[in-house]
């Protein structure tokens, strides 16, 4: 019987790339996302090689999350790895210019959504025991502040601390917990953040070499497939051409 991974936000970016990476290794896949057409397309692609179960899901909906887990087919119930990938960034403008609804959406998705899924899947991960993993998608924004990050950065700081504290609670169960924290990566993420402004999204990556979704997927897979006695607590990764900025100074 092949190992089983559950990936949220599997319809694009890191989630889709992770689904392909785990499929390459023969894992069975539980894929969730809000866009049914994309889920269907990905399932059709990957089901040629591995077993795939899909569920249209908004992770913000606590009851829907629990229903998806409760209704998993018997062959998909013994989840070994959970990849909490679903998340988004909105409103790159300064905090004082942001629509409050955008802040609420980020909190509901990046924090509450991750908590909803984790809580629902924990019992089966604990039952699986040694070698089971939770991989949370964080961000360098959770560690390093920058203008326009406001609630997005704060939500990813939550992911980091939730990862660490969950790890403490799960000590002795065999379940590992990791925060994978990427820097600049070229995915649909930026297009969503800019409200669909393709020119602004393209400008961010112009004349540099960002991470690709496949780079991050490789790290997700790596942390989940290390020997059972090894836990990567946090894995921060940036493109070689990205580094930290100097402190901002306001001058007269």
UniProtKB/Swiss-Prot annotation:
Biochemical pathway: Organosulfur degradation
Subunit details: Homodimer and heterotetramer.
Binding residues for substrate: 139
Domain of life of the native organism: Bacteria
Entry binding sites for NADP(+): 6-30
Name by which UniProt lists this protein: Sulfoacetaldehyde reductase 2
UniProt xrefs under Gene3D superfamilies: NAD(P)-binding Rossmann-like Domain (3.40.50.720)
GO MF entries: oxidoreductase activity
InterPro entries found in the cross-reference section: NAD(P)-bd_dom_sf (IPR036291), Sc_DH/Rdtase_CS (IPR020904), SDR_fam (IPR002347)
The protein's role, per its UniProt record: Catalyzes the formation of isethionate from 2-sulfoacetaldehyde in the deaminative pathway of taurine. Constitutively expressed enzyme that only mediates a small part of the activity observed in taurine-grown cells.
UniProtKB keywords: NADP, Oxidoreductase
Entry EC number(s): 1.1.1.313
Active site (UniProt): 152
Induction: Constitutively expressed.
